[in-house]
Protein backbone atom coordinates (compact mmCIF):
# COMPACT_ATOMS: atom_id res chain seq x y z
CA UNK A 1 0.00 0.00 0.00
CA UNK A 2 1.47 3.31 -1.06
CA UNK A 3 0.88 6.18 1.34
CA UNK A 4 1.90 9.80 0.84
CA UNK A 5 3.83 11.16 3.83
CA UNK A 6 4.32 14.90 4.34
CA UNK A 7 7.65 15.60 6.03
CA UNK A 8 8.19 18.72 8.18
CA UNK A 9 11.16 20.96 7.41
CA UNK A 10 13.09 19.83 10.50
CA UNK A 11 13.07 16.19 9.30
CA UNK A 12 13.85 16.82 5.63
CA UNK A 13 17.56 16.28 6.26
CA UNK A 14 16.64 12.58 6.45
CA UNK A 15 14.70 12.63 3.17
CA UNK A 16 17.25 14.52 1.11
CA UNK A 17 15.13 17.65 1.28
CA UNK A 18 11.98 15.96 0.02
CA UNK A 19 8.76 17.51 1.35
CA UNK A 20 6.55 14.58 0.34
CA UNK A 21 7.66 10.95 0.20
CA UNK A 22 5.83 7.65 -0.19
CA UNK A 23 5.96 4.74 2.19
CA UNK A 24 4.44 1.28 2.46
CA UNK A 25 2.67 -0.48 5.31
CA UNK A 26 -0.69 -1.75 6.54
CA UNK A 27 -0.41 0.13 9.85
CA UNK A 28 1.27 3.30 11.03
CA UNK A 29 3.87 1.13 12.83
CA UNK A 30 4.78 -0.61 9.54
CA UNK A 31 4.78 2.72 7.72
CA UNK A 32 7.29 4.23 10.18
CA UNK A 33 9.47 1.10 9.90
CA UNK A 34 9.38 1.42 6.10
CA UNK A 35 10.24 5.12 6.31
CA UNK A 36 13.18 4.32 8.59
CA UNK A 37 14.49 1.63 6.25
CA UNK A 38 14.35 4.06 3.32
CA UNK A 39 15.47 7.13 5.29
CA UNK A 40 17.70 5.85 8.11
CA UNK A 41 17.40 7.77 11.36
CA UNK A 42 13.96 9.24 10.80
CA UNK A 43 12.32 6.53 12.91
CA UNK A 44 14.18 7.49 16.07
CA UNK A 45 13.03 11.08 15.61
CA UNK A 46 9.40 9.89 15.51
CA UNK A 47 9.41 7.11 18.11
CA UNK A 48 10.78 6.46 21.57
CA UNK A 49 10.57 3.32 23.72
CA UNK A 50 6.89 3.97 24.51
CA UNK A 51 5.67 4.81 21.00
CA UNK A 52 5.18 8.13 19.25
CA UNK A 53 7.32 10.84 20.76
CA UNK A 54 5.36 13.25 22.91
CA UNK A 55 6.18 16.29 20.79
CA UNK A 56 5.48 14.71 17.41
CA UNK A 57 1.96 14.86 16.02
CA UNK A 58 0.94 12.47 13.26
CA UNK A 59 -2.24 12.84 11.25
CA UNK A 60 -3.85 10.28 8.96
CA UNK A 61 -6.13 12.02 6.47
CA UNK A 62 -6.27 15.01 8.87
CA UNK A 63 -7.21 12.82 11.89
CA UNK A 64 -4.81 12.81 14.86
CA UNK A 65 -3.66 9.17 15.21
CA UNK A 66 -3.54 9.56 19.01
CA UNK A 67 -7.35 9.60 18.89
CA UNK A 68 -7.46 6.63 16.51
CA UNK A 69 -5.33 3.54 17.22
CA UNK A 70 -1.93 5.21 17.60
CA UNK A 71 0.78 3.14 15.92
CA UNK A 72 -1.79 0.40 15.32
CA UNK A 73 -3.87 2.69 13.11
CA UNK A 74 -4.50 0.99 9.78
CA UNK A 75 -3.49 2.82 6.63
CA UNK A 76 -4.77 2.21 3.12
CA UNK A 77 -3.48 2.79 -0.37
CA UNK A 78 -3.88 6.46 -1.24
CA UNK A 79 -4.03 7.69 2.37
CA UNK A 80 -2.10 10.78 3.41
CA UNK A 81 0.04 11.00 6.56
CA UNK A 82 1.25 14.33 7.89
CA UNK A 83 4.03 14.56 10.48
CA UNK A 84 4.13 17.77 12.50
CA UNK A 85 6.47 18.68 15.33
CA UNK A 86 4.62 20.26 18.24
CA UNK A 87 5.29 23.94 18.74
CA UNK A 88 5.68 25.35 22.23
CA UNK A 89 6.17 28.85 23.40
CA UNK A 90 5.82 31.04 26.37
Description of each model-found segment:
Residues 1-89:
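Ubiquitin-like/PB1-type beta-grasp interaction modules and other compact soluble beta-rich domains
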